[in-house]
Regions:
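Catalytic or ion-coupling anion/metal-binding cores of large enzyme and transporter domains
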Residues: 2-57, 64-85, 90-91, 96-101, ...
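A short, small-residue-rich loop immediately preceding and capping a beta-strand
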Residues: 116-137, 149-152
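Glycine-rich, highly charged phosphate/nucleotide-binding loops
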Residues: 101-110
Length: 567
């Protein structure tokens, strides 16, 4: 890239860091780690990596980072790589460690922001893999508003067990099946060994793949990049081009807040609805919208989902995995279907310099693919996201509906004040058909950290109760969850929400058509119970968890921390 194509030096933040006599100490330290005078004359591009060797989702990101850096150099820039944290949802699931997961989203965003501000980088490429690294990196890019993009590491390949494809979802459900005597321990051990064959994020339309798709639809990842699997050799080429692309963004001065508009956010929500994506996307897109300073409310998800057909037949509730979607045509095919359904704001801009409509029209569909349905033959006429309100959820809660769940369910409450207590009851087979399992004090403040209930929900499914019980919680659900499950109930129990007042045996009704979640108690009875209710003692009194509990907002606002921008 020639000098004439670059922004004026005065517009590059890095010039303040490395130019002039008084910056000799800074240059000396940069030279100590291998940078040359020639390197420092070029734009400095931060490569924000979330590599970690504790999980497959991010284990290959060092390799991809090298290709990104090569692309930056080819485009005329100097890449500077740094790392931030990551917490594995899948590994920590069902333990106290899971409380760190959602908290890590805020730390990832904060840490990237601090490194980039502290070193005056001119642009950023963020590499993500697991669930919270995707929204965390995007939140940081929007705060910084430098020419930048996010590159997703890609999905894991499906495992193979007894002639059928499997994912980590099957292992979680195998635990429940084993406890119910429906699977032997030997078979579970074999499944454990075969479910995860290598690097990459969990292989269904779970949270990571849902959010990677959403970021492509937002326009902050190059169209076609996210669905390339982690082990596909083409992924290295994608990474190289991402490095080149950030230099083109710098040349055009195209920044994230010009890309992440209201239209772009609605495109992302529509894609989640059309693919039966993770309910975690509600939390994360609300948080992303806040960083972009774009109005987005929880009820917008329901409004968009009502008008969007469910088109993708994907796990956890369907047949196909993420690599199947790649072979069918990738995220571009989803965009194309939404364009055909008139559910796409086609003029929204993307990092490629093309509109999302242009990208949708360029998408190629593999002949005879069976992953993404034609618009005229949807799996169901409305999307997979449903927002309920009612006496138990005045500020809303989130349900994923994919056509297999009952539209109405009424049953007696079985109340548990922690995930562990609920899991023990299920494993000991103390839950009966028709019960409504209530797991509370697991919200953003109460947990703190709003744990995912996959261990609980998978145990329910594994024991054959997936269609005969319901569950509601102020915690979250994994993207691998399926069945009638209401999460993100707000206000949460720890804040005095109605969920805190429920007792064993209270009749709870889910009415999906009416968008209601109610408990059969009079206002007078709820008031009497509220008078006797006392908030529980904080589970953490110092450290990051206590700090998070103090500052985090409601799930209905994205469970974000920090001062609202309008304050």
């Amino acid at each position: 890239m020639g000098d004439k194509a670059m922004p004026r030096a005065a517009r590059l933040p890095s010039r303040t860091l490395v130019e002039g006599m008084d910056r000799a100490p800074a240059r000396a330290m940069l030279k100590a780690v291998g940078f040359t005078d020639a390197d420092l004359k070029r734009p400095l591009i931060g490569v924000a990596n979330t590599w970690i060797e504790v999980m497959p989702c991010n284990a290959h990101l060092r390799r991809l980072a090298e290709r990104v850096k090569a692309g930056v150099r080819a485009g005329g820039g100097t890449p500077i790589e740094f790392n931030t944290i990551a917490v594995s949802d899948g590994i920590s699931m069902g333990t106290e460690g899971m409380k760190a997961s959602l908290v890590s989203r805020e730390v990832i965003a904060d840490s990237i922001e601090l490194v980039v501000r502290g070193h005056l980088f001119d642009g950023v490429v963020a590499l993500s893999g697991c669930d919270k690294t995707i929204p965390g990196t995007v939140m940081a890019l929007l705060r910084l508003d430098l020419p930048s993009l996010m590159l997703y590491g890609g999905s894991i390949d499906a495992g193979a067990f007894r002639g059928r494809p499997v994912t980590i979802q099957d292992v979680f459900e195998g635990v429940g099946a084993c406890a119910a005597g429906r699977m032997s321990r030997r078979d579970l051990a074999e499944l454990e060994d075969r479910a995860c064959p290598g690097p990459g994020a969990c292989g269904g339309q779970f949270t990571a793949n849902t959010m990677a798709m959403a970021v492509e639809m937002l326009g902050l990842s190059p169209m076609g990049s996210a669905s390339v699997p982690a082990t596909d050799p083409f992924k290295d080429d994608v990474a190289f081009e991402a490095g080149r692309l950030v230099m083109a963004l710098l040349r055009r001065n195209l920044r994230p807040r010009r890309i992440v508009t209201r239209d772009a956010l609605e495109n992302a929500v529509a894609a989640v609805a059309a693919t039966g994506g993770s309910t975690n996307s509600v939390l994360h897109l609300l948080a992303i919208a806040r960083e972009a300073e774009v109005p987005l409310a929880i009820d917008d998800f329901d409004r968009i989902s009502r008008k969007t057909p469910l088109l993708a037949d994907m796990k956890p509730w369907g047949r196909c995995v993420a690599t199947d979607l790649y072979r069918a045509g990738g995220v571009g095919l989803i965009a194309r279907r939404l364009l055909q359904a008139r559910r796409l704001h086609a003029r929204a801009m993307t990092v490629t310099g093309r509109t999302i409509g242009d990208e949708a029209r360029r998408a190629r569909e593999t002949p005879h693919q069976a992953v993404v349905r034609p618009v005229a033959k949807p799996l169901q006429p409305t999307g997979g996201l449903v927002i309920l309100h009612g006496t138990l959820a005045p500020d809303g809660c989130v349900v994923k509906m994919t056509g297999h769940e009952p539209m109405r369910f009424r049953g007696p409450a079985r109340v548990f004040d922690s995930e562990e207590a609920a899991f023990r009851a299920i494993q000991r087979r103390r839950i009966a058909r028709g019960d409504v399992i209530v797991v509370r004090y697991e919200g953003p403040r109460g947990g703190p950290g709003m744990r995912e209930m996959l261990a609980v929900t998978a145990a329910i499914v594994g024991q054959g109760l997936g269609q005969s019980v319901a569950l509601l919680t102020d915690g979250r659900f994994s993207g691998a969850t399926h069945g009638l499950m209401a999460g993100h109930v707000a206000p949460e129990a720890a804040s005095g929400g109605p969920l805190a007042l429920v007792r064993d045996g209270d009749a709870i009704t889910f009415d999906i058509k009416a968008r209601r979640l109610d408990v059969a108690l009079s206002r007078a009875e709820l008031a009497r119970r509220r008078e006797r209710w006392r908030p529980p003692r904080p589970r953490y009194t110092h450290g990051v968890m206590a700090k998070y509990a103090r500052f985090v907002s409601s799930a209905s606002e994205g469970a974000v921390t920090g001062t609202p921008r309008h304050a």
